[in-house]
């Protein structure tokens, strides 16, 4: 087949109508709505729920939703739980479906060596469910639940990244659009924030961690300058607050009030919240989704199919092989069954472990009750033996003879 395609350019003599395509796309997008899946990860108390609510200017999640739920007596076995919250919000007729995934319990255990594993499993599970839906014959109802943006909240220590931070980011940086965030930056001075940013970026570069950077369109100077400003602000030092406070000049702003002054959430001179909002929502929401679909998901899909023994070359784009397609579907089905089996085994092992712990607690209670009853019985036996000894001792002592009754005097005048 010849690849030399001759393109003939002609000037149209009349209005055809394809110049109306952007309007068609706009109407379709408004009718269909948009979606955004955000994973917000970090230790408890770093203001994840507050920042998400500040981003969308409404209560998407509550602080209780992200609280750590574990027994006080088992703090050494804190487990990471995955929680998801969905909300549909509307602004000027445009609908946005927001899904926020959090991981309460992350970093709260004594041993955090594999604290990242449930988070990575959740990301992979979402890729797998999308791959499964995409492989069906009827794909009209494919729901995109893949993670579009991964906000990692860094504790504002002012030093450098911890081993846990590096371990998690190295596990997820090739699966998600990683966006590091310095939480509660109002606890640091401007100089400390600048130095902290340099150390974080140095650690990220040294570890080979990839973070999401928006595309710089050089042909648009204003847009390019805005993009470079966003990139230069990495990692974002943010402050979140949904409360309004009054500034010294009388303005009502979203922010936090301190004895030394007011820090404004929406003021770029105070923190990087505005730049984070531009990256996530205002300017690059669709780019985040496209990069997830065209790069991150495709890389995951290719690697997964290779592990399953399915090789793909350029011939699939030139012809359709039903046998190969059937083999691919069979392999995907087997992978799905294997995944379900692994999940069932995991649930079974978890239930067995919980049952064993319950039996161990019951056994300990029974031992304690047995010991208590044995101690009581021993005390009763000892008490009875003491009483028996006292009785035997009393028998051995000499007893006084019984008193003789006094002789009765005979009455005179009567015969006896």
UniProtKB/Swiss-Prot annotation:
GO CC field: ascospore wall; Gin4 complex; mating projection base; prospore membrane; septin complex; septin filament array
Keyword Transcription regulation present in the record's keywords: the answer is no
Q: Where in the cell is it found?
A: Bud neck
- Using the UniProt annotation, give all residue ranges assigned to the region (G1 motif): 42-49
Per UniProt, which keywords does this protein have?
Answer: Cell cycle, Cell division, Coiled coil, GTP-binding, Nucleotide-binding
Task: Please give the start and end residues of each transmembrane region.
Answer: none
* Any one Gene Ontology molecular-function term assigned to this protein's record: structural constituent of cytoskeleton
A single GO BP annotation from the record?
A: septin ring disassembly
Positions of GTP binding: 42-49, 79, 105, 184-192, 240, 256
Q: Where is this region: G4 motif?
A: 183-186
Region: Disordered; residue ranges are: 392-416
* Every Septin-type G domain range: 32-307
Q: Which residues form a coiled coil?
A: 323-399
Segments carrying the region annotation (G3 motif) are: 102-105
Q: Is Repressor one of the keywords?
A: no
Family (UniProt): Belongs to the TRAFAC class TrmE-Era-EngA-EngB-Septin-like GTPase superfamily. Septin GTPase family.
- Function, in words: Plays a role in the cell cycle. Involved in the formation of the ring of filaments in the neck region at the mother-bud junction during mitosis.
Q: Protein name, please?
A: Cell division control protein 3
- Gene (UniProt): CDC3
């Amino acid at each position: 087949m010849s690849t030399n395609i001759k393109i003939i350019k002609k000037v149209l003599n009349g209005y055809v109508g394809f110049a109306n395509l952007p309007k068609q796309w706009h109407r379709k997008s408004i009718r269909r709505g948009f979606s955004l899946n955000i994973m917000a990860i970090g230790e408890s108390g770093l203001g994840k729920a507050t920042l998400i609510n500040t981003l969308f200017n409404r209560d998407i999640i509550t602080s209780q939703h992200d609280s750590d739920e574990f027994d006080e007596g088992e703090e050494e076995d804190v487990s990471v739980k995955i929680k998801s919250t969905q909300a549909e919000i509307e602004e000027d007729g445009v609908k946005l479906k927001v899904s926020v995934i959090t991981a309460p319990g992350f970093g709260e255990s004594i041993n955090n060596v594999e604290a990242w594993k449930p988070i990575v499993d959740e990301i992979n599970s979402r890729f797998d469910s999308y791959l499964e839906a995409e492989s069906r014959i009827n794909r009209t109802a494919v729901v995109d639940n893949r993670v579009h943006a991964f906000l990692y909240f860094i504790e504002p220590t002012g030093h450098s990244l911890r081993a846990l931070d590096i371990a998690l980011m190295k596990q997820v940086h090739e699966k998600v659009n990683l966006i590091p965030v310095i939480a509660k930056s109002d606890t640091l001075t401007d100089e400390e924030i600048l130095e902290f940013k340099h150390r974080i970026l140095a650690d990220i570069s040294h570890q080979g961690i990839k973070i999401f950077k928006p595309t710089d369109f050089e042909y648009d100077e204003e847009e390019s300058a805005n993009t470079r400003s966003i990139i230069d602000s990495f990692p974002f030092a943010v402050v979140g607050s949904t409360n309004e406070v009054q500034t010294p000049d009388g303005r009502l702003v979203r922010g936090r009030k301190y004895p030394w002054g007011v820090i404004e959430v929406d003021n770029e001179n105070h923190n990087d919240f505005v730049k984070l909002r531009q990256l996530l929502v205002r300017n690059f929401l669709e780019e985040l989704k496209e990069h997830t679909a065209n790069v991150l998901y495709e890389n995951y899909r290719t690697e997964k199919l290779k592990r399953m023994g399915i090789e793909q070359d350029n011939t699939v784009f030139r012809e359709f092989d039903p046998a190969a397609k059937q083999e691919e579907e069979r392999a995907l089905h087997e992978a799905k069954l294997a995944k379900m089996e692994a999940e069932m085994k995991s649930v079974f092992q978890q239930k067995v472990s919980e049952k064993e712990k319950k039996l161990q607690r019951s056994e300990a209670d029974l031992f304690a009750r047995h010991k208590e009853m044995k101690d009581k019985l021993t005390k009763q036996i000892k008490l009875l033996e003491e009483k028996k000894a006292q009785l035997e001792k009393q028998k051995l002592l000499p007893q006084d003879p019984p008193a003789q009754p006094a002789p009765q005097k005979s009455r005179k005048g009567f015969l006896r």
